[in-house]
Amino acid sequence: MERPIRHGAKTKQCRCLGTTELSMSQIDHQVHSIGPEVTGSRIFKFIAFLYGIAAYLVFFVTILYAIGFVMGLVVPKTIDTGTDTSTAEAVIINLLLMALFAVQHSVMARQRFKTWWTQFVSKPIERSTYVLFASLSLLLLFWQWRPLPTVIWEVEDPDLAVTLVTVSFAGWVLVFTSTFIINHFELFGLHQVTNHLVGKEATPPRFKTPLLYKFVRHPIYLGFIVAFWAAPVMTAGHLLFAAVTTIYIFVGIALEERDLIDLFGDEYRQYKQRVSMLIPWRRSV
């Protein structure tokens, strides 16, 4: 049956089922709840998802370029090519470029910075933003890098030279493999924006040591070190890059492990005592 319902100065007709009666304000509220706010939320989630994909693609192009840059393969500008300058100027510029990357990469990874940063950047895109900024700082380094062409060593034996190139490439393979072992897409932000898009809650981090992580604590960093140092031709510029990045890796490990101890406590302390930092099968000190 239909009954008149008084709403302000107007009389409305509302169909009632049994003894349940909906006021016009309740109807308005229900209509509103599936209206622009929900639609807008979905749009923003989709935009965040596209942003995460874009950041990942920039990273992917950057890491591929990094392989060519270090190994001197395919890419138009490598570690040994570019604008010729004085040695002092080249060293200063290159050190500043590496320092910029190191500061960005380390500061934005710290929990204190993340807590402050996520006041302005949505949590689901925090990791993608970090990945994007790191990629852009590396692209700047590749673009502005100054060569130092003085040869430190050059392997003349063709077989040994090929072996070193193969070892360097194996280092890059180790980097990629290690990221997939621990969840490549979470490490580079795609997992977070995908979960946000479908409305899935983020799961609390769990400490795990799959495959390579049973032998070394930081196989990704080990892969980078191998890739940077296994060079049949080592110029002064390549040596500067390899040496500074290796030093930064050890600094980064110290900062990262401090955060991991804060997060996992004794579980990570025991892992640190049991497993070597970088050298497989060597007991940790």
Curated annotation (Swiss-Prot):
The chain crosses the membrane at residues 55-75, 88-108, 132-152, 162-182, 224-244. It is a multi-pass membrane protein. Its EC number is 2.1.1.334. It is an enzyme of class 2 (transferase). InterPro entries: MddA, NnrU_dom, Nurim-like. Signal peptide: none annotated. One of its GO terms (biological process) is methylation. Gene3D superfamilies: 1.20.120.1630. Keywords: Membrane, Methyltransferase, S-adenosyl-L-methionine, Transferase, Transmembrane, Transmembrane helix. Its main location: membrane. Pfam families: NnrU. It is found in: Membrane. GO terms for cellular component: membrane. GO terms for molecular function: methyltransferase activity. The keyword Heme does not apply. The keyword Ribosomal protein does not apply. It catalyses: methanethiol + S-adenosyl-L-methionine = dimethyl sulfide + S-adenosyl-L-homocysteine + H(+). Belongs to the nurim family. Catalyzes the methylation of methanethiol (MeSH) to yield dimethylsulphide (DMS). NCBIfam families: MeththiolMtaseMddA (NF045656). PANTHER family: NURIM. This is Methanethiol S-methyltransferase 1.
